[in-house]
Every structure is written in structure tokens, then in C-alpha cells.
Amino acid sequence: MNYQEIENKLIPLRDYEKSCREIYLANPEAFRHVVWNWEDFKEQFRRTDTSGYVLGEKAPVFMGNVLTEQDCFPDENMECSIIIHDRYAPPFYHNLKFIKVVYALKGRCRFFAQGKTQDRECLLEEGDFVIVPPEMNQAVFTWEEDAVTVNIILKRSTFGEAFYSLLLENDSISDFFWQMLY
């Protein structure tokens, strides 16, 4: 399978993405701010809604606050997992117990990080990526139908082994990775 064939398989919306798109199109304003869970999103949606759209009791996608290695690695021998980010899913903060690389494979997405004093937001254009350390509250929002945002999930131990020589350097990049791992 070549690159174009792979991309073509990733573009069609999955059923739950279609549900999220319907909600987004009813009230895009509700997606402008990051929430913590479905209840927070429903409240935000109600405050900004002019469409009369009625949200369901349950979220159409997973909106848990903590993701562990066990959640993303069904086989404990796996070192890396690649997960396509759900398009149109409400941006919600969640904490990771592993390292994640958010990669804008096609189109754009927004990345949010919760800081100690101020939240940060950045636009990732096609080809951009961000490395997310463990224990960081973060969120991603992909709102373009033909966009593909990829989450590359790495175990802490795998990252340390793969970048061992970089960790031995004495510079700001190695300091960042040391802090991320330990």
C-alpha cells in the first residue's frame, strides 16, 4: 500500500466522528474552549447554543481524564502505538502516563497545554508535531474533515532507550528529555 492509498483510508469519517461533526456544525462556538469532561462540554454547549440541538447524555467519544500505558498498549510487549485522533471531538484536558507525539499528518489541528499560571494553545499545520511529556494536562482539537492528526504513543522506557545517546548530552534538549522521563 502506498502513501496515497493509506491517506485515502484515513480520510473518511468514522461513525462517532460524524456524530461529533453534527454537534460541531450545530454550535462551533462550544468547541472554542477546552473542557474537562462531557458534563462541562454540555454546559458550555447550552450557554452558547442558538440552534436548539439537544446533546445526548453520553459523549460520542471517550472523554476520560487519565490515560495509562495499559489503555493504549493492549499487548504489554508493544513499545509504540499509533492512534488516529478523533476529528470534531470536543477538546478536553486529559493527563497521560506516557509520552505522546501529536503529528498533523494532513490538515491542521489545535494543541492545548494547561500551564501553572496560563493555558497555552498552538496551531499545528500539516507536518508539524509536538512532543507531550507524561503528567501534562493537554488537549487536541481537529476540526477539518479531511485532516488527519496522528497520536504516536511511546512508553517512557522505550523513549529512554531510543534516545539514550541524546540523553547523555549536556544541553537544554537533553535536560528537557530527562525531566520528561523522570
Specify the residue positions occupied by each region the protein language model found.
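N-terminal low-complexity or simple alpha-helical regulatory segments
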Residues: M1-D75
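A hydrophobic/aromatic-rich effector-binding and dimerization subdomain
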Residues: N2-I6, E57-C72, E76-M78, W143-Y182
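Conserved short histidine dyad/triad with adjacent acidic residue
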Residues: V66-L67, M78-L96, N137
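Short histidine-centered beta-strand/loop micro-motifs
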Residues: A89-L96, A113, C122, F141-W143
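Short, conserved beta-strand element in jelly-roll/cupin
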Residues: H94-G115, I153-L154
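Extracellular structured ligand-interaction cores
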Residues: L96-I99, N137, D146-T149
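Histidine-centered metal-chelating micro-motifs
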Residues: R110, V130, P134-V140, T158-G160
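Short acidic-glycine-tyrosine-enriched beta hairpin
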Residues: G115-P134, E144, V148
